[in-house]
């Protein structure tokens, strides 16, 4: 790959919304095809491999409930709606904590229950505290226990291989802190060449991680894989490379007897001496040649035994034919 001067990676825009971050980056110039390679690789890793904490286990202590198809006295939403809202709570961990992390909710009505009402241990922060969970009236008195676990991507509740205790409701693990990634390729000009490319990368993330942090993490994951391959190359045992000799098999189509008889004697590829002897005796085609016996050919001037053997061999190899013997 040719070294390209003037290549730049730039942050073109960054916006902070109430519940997410947005950033747009550009990288150019790139050799043709590299923008697709880089953009697609980063997108896949960003969406699938950035880990985080997510609420995955819920238990309604007060009032005591045992499944998601129930209702809660004093709450506008039923348990299913509250669980769906809990899955959208965004958590940031500022210090190392063991997974799972226990969280709690204690809330009396009337009022609105939000993510900010979740009580977290030291080092764990709810980064979207205004996120709506439920509306409570004056009869509501809620106590909920939650567990947040560490993971990546999306893990269905059925795949977590855990048997919850009675009263615990297991949720799907929506771990990925990256909401969406787009990439776009544009053509750019470098000197007289117009086939270079510019990669535009757009990243949307939850408030638990900034796009720049997610991008750095994804790059580290990719580099770790390539470094492993590079370091492993020296340990890979070289296998002997077999030399395969390809033999070309040429099959000539003989054709019908009429076609063969009309072919020129030049197609036998005889030596000049033998060919000239035949031509001087008016032998122009294969048919003319086969009309003569071996004794008749031997009477041709300068046509000796060596020439006869050559004609025999060529007729046999090329057309599967043979000369007639003389009459005894």
From Swiss-Prot:
Cellular-component GO terms for this entry: cytoplasm; DNA-directed RNA polymerase complex
Keyword terms of this UniProt record: DNA-directed RNA polymerase, Nucleotidyltransferase, Transcription, Transferase
Lineage top rank: taxon: Bacteria
Pfam families named in the record: RNA_pol_A_bac (PF01000), RNA_pol_A_CTD (PF03118), RNA_pol_L (PF01193)
NCBIfam families: PRK05182.1-2, PRK05182.2-5, rpoA
Domain notes: The N-terminal domain is essential for RNAP assembly and basal transcription, whereas the C-terminal domain is involved in interaction with transcriptional regulators and with upstream promoter elements.
Designated name of the protein: DNA-directed RNA polymerase subunit alpha
Taxonomic source organism: Fervidobacterium nodosum (strain ATCC 35602 / DSM 5306 / Rt17-B1)
């Amino acid at each position: 790959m040719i070294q390209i001067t003037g290549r730049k990676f730039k942050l073109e825009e960054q916006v902070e919304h109430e519940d997410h971050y947005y950033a747009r980056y550009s990288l150019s110039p790139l050799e043709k095809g590299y923008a697709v390679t880089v953009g697609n690789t980063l997108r896949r890793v960003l969406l699938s491999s950035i880990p985080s904490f997510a609420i995955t286990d819920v238990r309604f202590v007060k009032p005591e409930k045992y499944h998601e198809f129930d209702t809660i006295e004093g709450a506008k939403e039923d348990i299913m709606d509250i669980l769906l809202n809990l899955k959208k709570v965004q958590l940031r961990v500022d210090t190392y904590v063991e997974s799972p992390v226990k969280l709690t909710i204690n809330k009396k009505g009337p009022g609105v229950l939000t993510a900010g009402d979740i009580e977290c241990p030291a080092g764990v922060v709810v980064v979207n505290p205004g996120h709506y969970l439920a509306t409570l009236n004056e009869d509501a008195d809620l106590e909920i226990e939650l567990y947040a676990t560490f993971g990546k991507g999306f893990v269905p509740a059925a795949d977590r291989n855990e048997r919850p205790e009675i009263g615990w409701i297991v949720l799907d693990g929506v771990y990925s802190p990256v909401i969406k990634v787009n990439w776009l390729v544009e053509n750019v000009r470098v000197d007289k060449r117009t086939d270079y490319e510019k990669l535009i990368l757009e990243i949307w993330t939850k408030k638990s991680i900034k796009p720049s942090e997610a991008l750095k993490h994804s790059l580290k994951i990719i580099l770790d894989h390539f470094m492993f391959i590079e370091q492993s190359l020296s340990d890979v045992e070289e296998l002997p490379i077999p030399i395969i000799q390809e033999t070309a098999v040429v099959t000539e189509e003989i054709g019908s007897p009429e076609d063969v008889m009309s072919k020129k004697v030049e197609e036998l590829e005889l030596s000049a001496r033998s060919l000239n002897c035949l031509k001087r005796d008016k032998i122009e085609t294969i048919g003319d040649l086969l009309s003569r016996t071996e004794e008749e050919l031997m009477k041709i001037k300068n046509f000796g035994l060596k020439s006869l053997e050559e004609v025999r061999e060529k007729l046999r190899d090329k057309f599967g034919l043979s000369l007639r013997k003389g009459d005894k």
